[in-house]
């Protein structure tokens, strides 16, 4: 038996997912789910989120800045312009990386230094 303060951040996140699963949701919302996790734990969490999506047949809505998660989980991503607070692109991130005409989207997805 553990109290929340005694378990790792990754275990706390998995416990949160277990609580959400108990409700058999149609939509799961995640806000920066891998924040504070090491890359291996982040990948495991991404895999768990994908498994939940498939097993629960649930829609996933996720806010993240993690490129690995965007490409692993995102089949339809929305990109927002922080200055105008408007949507600047929407679609599969892998396709947007190749086809977007918006340099901000390309820069974000490639993390390039181009201007």
Regions found by a protein language model. Give the residues of each.
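Helical segment within the ABC ATPase nucleotide-binding domain
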Residues: 43-55
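Conserved beta-strand-loop-alpha-helix hinge in the C-terminal portion
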Residues: 83-108
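H-loop/switch region of ABC-family ATPase nucleotide-binding domains
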Residues: 64-65
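Conserved ABC ATPase signature
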Residues: 3-7, 11
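Helix N-cap at the start of a conserved alpha-helix in ABC-type nucleotide-binding domains
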Residues: 39-41
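Conserved catalytic motifs of ABC-family nucleotide-binding domains
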Residues: 24
């Amino acid at each position: 038996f553990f109290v929340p303060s005694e378990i790792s951040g990754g275990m706390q996140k998995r416990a949160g997912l277990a609580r959400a699963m108990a409700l058999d949701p149609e939509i799961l919302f995640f806000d920066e789910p891998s924040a504070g996790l090491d890359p291996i734990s982040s990948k495991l969490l991404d895999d768990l989120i994908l498994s939940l999506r498939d097993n629960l047949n649930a829609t996933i809505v996720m806010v993240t800045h993690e490129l690995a998660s965007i490409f692993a989980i995102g089949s339809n991503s929305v990109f927002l312009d922080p200055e105008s607070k408007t949507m600047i692109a929407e679609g599969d991130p892998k396709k947007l990386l190749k086809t977007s005409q918006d340099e901000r989207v390309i820069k974000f997805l490639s993390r390039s230094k181009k201007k």
